[in-house]
Amino acid sequence: MRFGPVPPRAAVGAILAHSEDLGDRRLRKGKRLTEEDTAALAAAGRRQVVVARLEPGDLHEDTAADRLAAAICGDGIAPQGPSATGRVNLRAAGPGVLVADSARVGALNRVDPMLTLATLPPFRRLAASEMVGTVKVISYGVAADSVARAEAAGQGALRLARPVLATATLIETRVGPDTPPDKGRRAMRARLAALGLSLSPRVVVAHDTDAVAEALAAAQGELVLILTASATSDIHDTAPEGLRRAGGTVAQFGMPVDPGNLLFLGAVSGRPVIGLPGCARSPALNGADWVLDRVACGLPVGPEEIAAMGLGGLLKESPARGRPRAD
C-alpha cells in the first residue's frame, strides 16, 4: 500500500486518509475518491490530499477484517458484519462462557501489527448477543499474504461453551431455629438464571453433617450448591463431611481467588457439588462465579484450573464482607 500526499487530481480512485470539510459537504476518511470528489477538493483550494492507494496483492481493510472475523469465530460466536472502517465486532449467539485460545490469539496478533484481535478475558460469562471481541484492521489496506497467515493462525480462536445443565438445588444451613434471610438465594438464582438454569424449591437444614448428607441425597438438581450458615474452615468441616457421608467426594477445598477463598468442589451421584463461600450471598463477582460458570457449561474445573485462577484472582472486595482485607 502506498500512503502520502498527492495533488487532488491524482487522487481519483485512492482512499481518503483524513476527513475533509469542504463547507457544503464533508468527505469522510476511508472514502474511495471519485472525480467529483477530487474536483471539489481542488475547488476548495486543497493543493494536496493525503490518500492510501492499494497495490497489487493488497486487500482493502473491510475485506481483510471480514475474512479474519470469519476465521476466528468458532461454535457459538458470530461476526456482526459486514465490516465498516476495517472493524468487525464478534458476538455470542447465546448465554455461556467464552473459551479463548490464547496461543491462537497471540499468534494472530503477531502476524502483522495492522491486523488485530481484542477479546474479553477467557472464561468470561456471556449473555446472548454480548460482544466478545473485535477485529480491527488498522491500515486502509494490508497484504493478502498477511491476511492469509493471520487467518490460519487465528482459526477457531474463540468459541462459546454453552450451558450443559438445566437445574440446580441450593442447600442452605441454619444455626438455631430461624430460617436465614433469602439474600443468598436471590443472588444465586440470578447467577443461575444468567446461564438459563432454574433453581429448585428452597432447602434449609440444620448446620449439621447428617442434615447436609440427607439434603444432598434428596437434592433434585443436576447441580448442587451448598451455602452454610457458618463458613467452611476446613476440608473436614460440616459441609464437606456431609458430602462424604452422602457418598460423595471432595476434590478441592480452597481457591486463590479473593473474595471466594473458602470454596469447595466435589461430586455426589455423578452430579457436581459446589460448597459456596459466604461472599456468594452478594451479587458482586467472586471466585464462586468462576467455578459455577465453568461447571454449568461443562468445562473442566480441577486443581490445575483453580490454581491458575490466582492470576487475576484479586477481585473487588465485597461490601458484605465482615472483615475487610485492610483490617
What are these regions (language model features)?
Residues 43-47, 70-77, 128-131, 137, ...:
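Generic secondary-structure signature for well-ordered alpha-helical cores
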Residues 138-224:
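Phosphate-binding glycine-rich loops and their immediate beta-loop-alpha structural context
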Residues 9, 13, 42, 80-83, ...:
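Solvent-exposed alpha-helices and their adjacent loops that cap or buttress functional pockets
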Residues 55-163:
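Extended, charged alpha/beta regions that create polyanion-binding interfaces
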Residues 1-85:
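Short, low-complexity N-terminal leaders and the immediately following helix N-cap/first helix
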Residues 28, 34, 121-128, 258:
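Residue-level recognition of short, solvent-exposed, well-ordered loop/turn junctions
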Residues 200-327:
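Short glycine/threonine-rich loop/turn motifs
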Residues 50-52, 77-83, 142-144, 198-202, ...:
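Flexible, glycine/charged-enriched surface loops at secondary-structure junctions
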